[in-house]
């Protein structure tokens, strides 16, 4: 069952073409990047003391990669997204799903219980007013609850792939911190992730993969194509090897930034 908290009609395509969410789900769910982000997030939750069966809302759950990982770990997880089509694809008996637009007023159910943690993984870069979105995330958690946000990093890497996803920006630490400034949340720390990918993206920036007549999902799929085996194994190993360094805050740069905050 899908609950609806948002008021009015949300324009999901203004954030990312819904066809990308629907048509490429199977590809994304087995892609090393999304799987590695889910593993890092689960490890981070554990280090924050947020263990199963804590209640967690995954805002912008999209293809459901992290949502499924949370469920398998035993969390009481709720998936939230602006896209009704994406939610329909994830819907099955026993799963908690919510239609939620962080850019618009919303009204949780009368019996709403704040969550122990809220995730917004690669969400706020799609939103013009990212600070307002972060403040709304704070409304979802109980006092003492955690908010984890991840964003694409390094503005000089902004490229066609960002554009077709509806990204407004890539972040530096100071711009990510600014999004939390008046949110009512206390920003505890931030850290880089994906350091090993920076040289790869710098080497290919400025190149385009769109072909004449391409739909957004066709171009997106082209970006998701991996080199032949054993490249996928190497990618998984690279993410695994740097995970502890990322969580320790010892990476000096990365293609993503994570922020960890709590509600006082």
Predicted regions located by residue number:
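Conserved N-terminal segment of class I S-adenosyl-L-methionine
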Residues: 1-121, 131-134, 220-228, 232, ...
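Conserved S-adenosyl-L-methionine
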Residues: 185-195
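A short glycine-rich, Lys/Arg-flanked "PGG" loop and its adjoining helix->strand segment in the class I
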Residues: 131-146
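C-terminal helical/coil "lid" or tail adjacent to the Rossmann-like core of SAM-dependent
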Residues: 197-236
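Short, glycine-/aromatic-enriched active-site segment of Class I SAM-dependent methyltransferases
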Residues: 25-27, 147-169, 173-181
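C-terminal beta-strand of the catalytic ATP-binding
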Residues: 261-264
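A short His-aromatic
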Residues: 122, 126
